[in-house]
Amino acid sequence: MREPDFLNHFLKKGYFKKHAKAVLALSGGLDSMFLFKVLSTYQKELEIELILAHVNHKQRIESDWEEKELRKLAAEAELPIYISNFSGEFSEARARNFRYDFFQEVMKKTGATALVTAHHADDQVETILMRLIRGTRLRYLSGIKEKQVVGEIEIIRPFLHFQKKDFPSIFHFEDTSNQENHYFRNRIRNSYLPELEKENPRFRDAILGIGNEILDYDLAIAELSNNINVEDLQQLFSYSESTQRVLLQTYLNRFPDLNLTKAQFAEVQQILKSKSQYRHPIKNGYELIKEYQQFQICKISPQADEKEDELVLHYQNQVAYQGYLFSFGLPLEGESIQQIPVSRETSIHIRHRKTGDVLIQNGHRKKLRRLFIDLKIPMEKRNSALIIEQFGEIVSILGIATNNLSKKTKNDIMNTVLYIEKIDR
C-alpha cells in the first residue's frame, strides 16, 4: 500500500475531525515510525498539529542511542518531542502504566486532545488471544478499541485495520528482545500463533472475526438496554439473573478505567442484593454507593472536612443558601413555594444535622437518627439535609419532616411564615 492510501483511510474514518493537536506515541519500531511518516507528511491534510512522545525503557544497550536518533528525527521534521525514562523494576504492566501516565502528562502540557498509537491488526490478534488464555470476560475479547475516550482525551489507533506486512520497509529500530520468549506477548507471537496457524492457516482472520462479532453484540446490547435504568435496582432485579449480569456488565462499560475482575464483579452483585446502604471504594479511584433501591458508581470526589457554617436569618430578611432562597416574613410568589409557620419574635437558624438532634412529632421527641432510618432516607441526603431551627427547637427538616405542634400552640407562637424557593446553586 502507498502512503496516500493510508491518508485516504484516515480521512474516510474522520479520526482527527474533532482534534487540533495530537500526541503520537513513538517507540521507534516499524509501525510507529511509519505512522510518524504518514502523520508528519499529511499534517496539513489532516488539519492537526503533531507532537511526539517517547519512553526510553532503559532495558537495552541501544535504547539511549535510539533516543538520540529520535531527537534528531524530530528536529529534522521541526516537531516537538517529549521523552521520559522508565526506572524501577521492569514488567509489561508497569511499563504500560508508566507510558500512558507520561503520555497524559504531555497532552495536558501541550493541550492535545488525541493520543495516537500504532497498534495494528497483528497486535489485535495477540491481545485477543492473550485475554482468552487468561480467562477474561467475553466483552474484553472484542480486543483493542479503534477509538476510545478516556476522561477528556481520545485514544486513536488508525492502523488497527492493517497488518504489519502492509507497511513499507523504512528506517526503524529493531527491538531484539521481541525475539525472546520471556514475556507473555512474545510467547504468543513467536510460539503459540505459529503453531495454531499450522492447524488453521486463517487463524488470525478467525480471531479478528470473533472479536468483531463480540463487539457487534456488545454494541447491540448497549443500544437495546438504553432505556433501562440499571441504577434502579427494582427495575434491574425484575429481570432474570442472566440478564441482570449482562445489564450490569454493560453499565460498567461506562467506566473504561474501572476494570473489575470476575471476583470483584461478583462482590458488587452481592452488595447490590444484600446491603440496604453502602458506600465504599471499589477500584481505580471509583466508589460504589447504594441507597436502598438505587445505586451508582462514580469517581471519588474530595470531601470538605466540615459543612458550611450555620446561617442566621433575621425577620424581614432574605438569603440564598445551598440552592434555596429563604424569605423570613416577606412573601414569595409561585406554585413551588414552600411555606413553614414560624415566629417573628426571634431569628431563624439554618444548619445541617448535629449529634443528638430531635424533632417533636405527635407530642413525642424523636431522634433524627431514628427518624431517618424509619423513613429510609439515604445517607447522602441525611448529611445534606437542611434543618430549620427556632427557639432552640427544630421547626423543619427541609423536604423531609416538620415539627407538628398543636393547633393552639401554632396560633400562639407561629405568627409569620418562612417562604422557601428552590433555586439554582
From Swiss-Prot:
GO terms for cellular component: cytoplasm. It is an enzyme of class 6 (ligase). GO terms for molecular function: ATP binding; tRNA(Ile)-lysidine synthase activity. Its EC number is 6.3.4.19. Keywords: ATP-binding, Cytoplasm, Ligase, Nucleotide-binding, tRNA processing. ATP binds at S27, G28, G29, L30, D31, S32. GO terms for biological process: tRNA modification. It catalyses: cytidine(34) in tRNA(Ile2) + L-lysine + ATP = lysidine(34) in tRNA(Ile2) + AMP + diphosphate + H(+). Pfam families: ATP_bind_3, TilS_C. It is found in: Cytoplasm. CDD domains: TilS_N (cd01992). Belongs to the tRNA(Ile)-lysidine synthase family. The N-terminal region contains the highly conserved SGGXDS motif, predicted to be a P-loop motif involved in ATP binding. PANTHER family: TRNA(ILE)-LYSIDINE SYNTHASE-RELATED. Ligates lysine onto the cytidine present at position 34 of the AUA codon-specific tRNA(Ile) that contains the anticodon CAU, in an ATP-dependent manner. Cytidine is converted to lysidine, thus changing the amino acid specificity of the tRNA from methionine to isoleucine. This is tRNA(Ile)-lysidine synthase. It comes from Streptococcus pneumoniae (strain Taiwan19F-14).
